[in-house]
């Protein structure tokens, strides 16, 4: 806009100059008409030439001014371009530094986030461990609550039974008071005492004892009445007996005659019995002789069979001697041949031992070679990784060198354009200073490129060294493989025995692992039974209160579980926010606060106290269970062991052998039914099983009958 304004001012001045010249020419022409034509024309021509010269000078000056202004504008544009380039370079440098700082900050932030993530994971583990401990404590508390509920239920049952008994005693007292009018005053006192009995248990117990005494007196009176009735019945029976005796006395002579006849028959029968006894003795003797003869016949048949077997064996030995040519005529020859075979077996065993020792040595050598091969493979992998990293570094350096060369060429082109646009004389001091700075920058770029080239050459040299090292390692690996193949071919002849031994070792290890698993299962079952308390659920009634502590504890556990889940979700959101690198939300900043050391110490103390409490409870449970088992063994006479899940082994204390046992299996819902499994001992008592289990369907009767039978066997022995 300034250039256009200056051009318009120059044109307006030229136009005004031409107008002035034309006016002067008209004025001079009007004034000098009378002069001569030649003089006026000469003057006009000179004046016109002067005016043209002045106009030409003005035009040249304006053109010079315009050229100078264009030059200044070009210089300003060049300066502006240089300033913009310098500014862009400085901004690029600042951006590069800012990016480097930002990368460092991001790396530091990533480290912090990783540390925060590790702390969050550790905190989550601690929370999970705390949750597990709380769950264990809750299980223990629930177990205690169950025990307390059982005790409360038993207490309530006792209270209800006492109340029922009190009501019965009240009814009996009312009946006695109605029947006995003379005890009405005592009835009033008893009513007052019964009303007070509901409030005070001690007075109620005293009144119950008094009522029990009165009931005992009543029972004694009833017993006396029953005794009198029995005596009356006996007297009536005696009267009937007296009547019958009288009738029998009337029949006494006839009875005496019959008695004589019976005596005679008795003597005859005794004689017949004696003769019959003699005949039976003779018959038994003959039967014994017959049995001995039969046994002798059987023994003779057995001897003949054995003789035939021995003859067949002798014939087979003779045939073996003829076929093999061993010359075994006598037992001494056979024993000598057996001794020779044993000696051969010993020599073969020694050879086998030497072969196995050599095989073990070769296995050790093979193991060492395999270790060396693994080490060589690991070194080869490391060298390959290093080579890849060096190749990547070389590629990056080449790319960086190409970029630097492009920047250098660009700077040179810019400087060349500046040099072509401006003449040598028009350089200013600022331009020379910029040129020197550009030359210094070019020298620095040259130095940096030379350093990069040196690093590239060094990396290429290291890459060549690494390749040579990798080639040597591959050659060593091939040599080691060849050595291992030769070693394998050298001890392939004893590989079958080694495989057989390995199979035996694997079988033994499998059996050991199986036994360990069974042991763990049994220990878990024992712990489960100890924790459960070993009570019969079919006979034990569990009462739940309206304000049940276990339900409240479960509700608290559910609330704690929900709270922990929310905390885990907040922690996950915090971890995701930290991984993204963005700002942490305000709702997650509270979740990132870690507990103090005091809280951690208190929690650890609580955990230790809870663990100690659980350990003490376990010890108490174990001692109580042992006492309970001993008491059951002494009272019932049976030792109860858990073999597997829902199977129980009963061993009687009067058993003749330790292996004599019964195995019951719990079936039905919650083990309400028991089923007897077949064992060798159960096969020996089929009558008891048929009577008590199949017909009567009573396991206690079967066990008691079995105990009596075993006890009678031991006492009879």
UniProtKB/Swiss-Prot annotation:
One of its GO terms (molecular function) is identical protein binding. Keywords: Acetylation, Cell cycle, Cell division, Centromere, Chromosome, Coiled coil, Cytoplasm, Cytoskeleton, Isopeptide bond, Kinetochore, Mitosis, Nucleus, Phosphoprotein, Ubl conjugation. The modification N-acetylmethionine is found at residue 1. A motif (Nuclear localization signal) lies at residues 79-82. It is found in: Nucleus; Chromosome, Centromere, Kinetochore; Nucleus envelope; Cytoplasm, Cytoskeleton, Microtubule organizing center, Centrosome. One of its GO terms (cellular component) is mitotic spindle. One of its GO terms (biological process) is negative regulation of T cell proliferation. The modification N6-acetyllysine is found at residue 61. Residues 48-631 form a coiled coil. There is a cross-link at residue 61 (Glycyl lysine isopeptide (Lys-Gly) (interchain with G-Cter in SUMO2)). It holds the Pfam family MAD. InterPro entries: Mad1. Its main location: nucleus. Belongs to the MAD1 family. Component of the spindle-assembly checkpoint that prevents the onset of anaphase until all chromosomes are properly aligned at the metaphase plate. Forms a heterotetrameric complex with the closed conformation form of MAD2L1 (C-MAD2) at unattached kinetochores during prometaphase, recruits an open conformation of MAD2L1 (O-MAD2) and promotes the conversion of O-MAD2 to C-MAD2, which ensures mitotic checkpoint signaling. Homodimer. Dimerizes via its N- and C- terminal regions. Heterodimerizes with MAD2L1 in order to form a tetrameric MAD1L1-MAD2L1 core complex. Interacts with the closed conformation form of MAD2L1 (C-MAD2) and open conformation form of MAD2L1 (O-MAD2). It is unclear whether MAD1L1 dimerization promotes the conversion of closed to open conformation of MAD2L1. Formation of a heterotetrameric core complex containing two molecules each of MAD1L1 and of MAD2L1 promotes binding of another molecule of MAD2L1 to each MAD2L1, resulting in a heterohexamer. This is Mitotic spindle assembly checkpoint protein MAD1. It comes from Mus musculus.
């Amino acid at each position: 806009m300034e250039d256009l304004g200056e051009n318009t001012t120059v044109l307006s001045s030229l136009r005004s100059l031409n107008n002035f010249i034309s006016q002067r020419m008209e004025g001079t022409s009007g004034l000098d008409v009378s002069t001569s034509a030649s003089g006026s024309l000469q003057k006009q021509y000179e004046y016109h030439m002067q005016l043209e010269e002045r106009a030409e000078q003005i035009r040249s000056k304006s053109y010079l001014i315009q050229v100078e202004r264009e030059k200044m504008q070009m210089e300003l544009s060049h300066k502006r371009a240089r300033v913009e380039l310098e500014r862009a370079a400085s901004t690029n440098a600042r951006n590069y530094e800012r990016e480097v700082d930002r990368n460092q900050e991001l790396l530091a932030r990533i480290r912090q986030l990783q540390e925060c993530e590790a702390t969050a994971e550790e905190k989550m583990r601690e929370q999970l461990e705390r949750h597990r401990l709380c769950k264990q404590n809750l299980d223990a508390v629930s177990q205690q609550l169950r025990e307390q509920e059982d005790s409360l239920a038993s207490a309530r049952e006792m209270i209800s039974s006492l109340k029922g008994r009190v009501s019965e005693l009240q009814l009996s007292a009312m009946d006695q008071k109605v029947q006995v009018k003379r005890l009405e005053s005592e009835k009033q006192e008893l009513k007052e005492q019964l009303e007070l009995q509901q409030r005070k248990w001690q007075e109620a117990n005293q009144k119950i004892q008094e009522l029990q005494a009165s009931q005992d007196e009543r029972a004694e009176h009833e017993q006396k009445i029953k005794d009198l009735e029995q005596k009356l019945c006996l007297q009536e029976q005696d009267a009937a007996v007296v009547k019958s005796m009288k009738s029998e006395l009337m029949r006494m002579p006839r009875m005496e005659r019959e008695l004589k006849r019976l005596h005679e028959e008795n003597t005859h029968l005794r004689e017949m019995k004696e003769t019959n006894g003699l005949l039976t003795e003779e018959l038994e003797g003959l039967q014994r002789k017959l049995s001995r003869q039969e046994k002798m016949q059987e023994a003779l048949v057995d001897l003949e069979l054995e003789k035939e077997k021995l003859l067949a064996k002798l014939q087979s030995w003779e045939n073996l001697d003829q076929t093999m040519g061993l010359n075994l005529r006598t037992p001494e020859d056979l024993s000598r041949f057996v001794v020779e075979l044993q000696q051969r077996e010993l020599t073969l065993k020694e050879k086998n031992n030497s072969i196995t020792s050599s095989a073990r040595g070769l296995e050790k050598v093979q193991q060492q070679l395999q270790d060396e091969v693994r080490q060589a493979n690991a070194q080869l992998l490391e060298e390959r990784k290093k080579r890849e990293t060096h190749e990547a570094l070389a590629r990056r350096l080449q790319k960086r060198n190409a970029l630097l060369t492009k920047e250098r060429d660009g700077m040179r082109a810019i400087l060349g354009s500046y040099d072509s646009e401006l003449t040598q004389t028009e350089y200013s001091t600022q331009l020379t200073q910029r040129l020197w700075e550009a030359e210094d920058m070019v020298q620095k770029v040259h130095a940096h490129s030379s350093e990069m080239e040196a690093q590239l050459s060094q990396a290429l040299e290291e890459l060549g060294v690494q390749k040579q090292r990798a080639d040597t390692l591959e050659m060593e690996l091939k040599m080691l493989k060849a050595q291992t193949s030769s070693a394998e071919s050298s001890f392939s002849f004893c590989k079958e025995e080694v495989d057989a031994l390995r199979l035996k070792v694997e079988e033994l290890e499998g059996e050991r692992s199986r036994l360990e698993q069974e042991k763990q299962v049994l220990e878990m079952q024992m712990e489960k039974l100890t924790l459960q308390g070993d009570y019969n659920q079919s006979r034990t009634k569990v009462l739940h209160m309206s304000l049940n502590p276990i339900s409240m504890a479960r509700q608290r556990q559910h609330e704690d579980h929900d709270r922990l889940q929310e905390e885990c979700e907040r922690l996950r959101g915090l971890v995701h926010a930290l991984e993204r690198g963005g700002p942490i939300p305000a709702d997650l900043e509270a979740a990132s606060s870690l507990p103090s050391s005091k809280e951690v110490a208190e929690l650890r103390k609580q955990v230790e106290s809870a663990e100690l409490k659980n350990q003490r409870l376990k010890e108490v449970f174990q001692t109580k269970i042992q006492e309970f088992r001993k008491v059951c063994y002494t009272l019932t006479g049976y030792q109860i062991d858990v073999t597997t899940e829902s199977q129980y082994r009963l061993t009687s204390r009067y058993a003749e052998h330790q292996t004599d046992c019964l195995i019951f299996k719990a079936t039905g819902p919650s083990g309400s039914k028991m089923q007897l499994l077949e064992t060798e001992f159960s096969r020996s008592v089929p009558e008891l099983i048929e009577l008590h289990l199949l017909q009567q369907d009573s396991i206690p009767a079967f066990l008691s009958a079995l105990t009596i039978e075993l006890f009678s066997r031991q006492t009879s022995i």
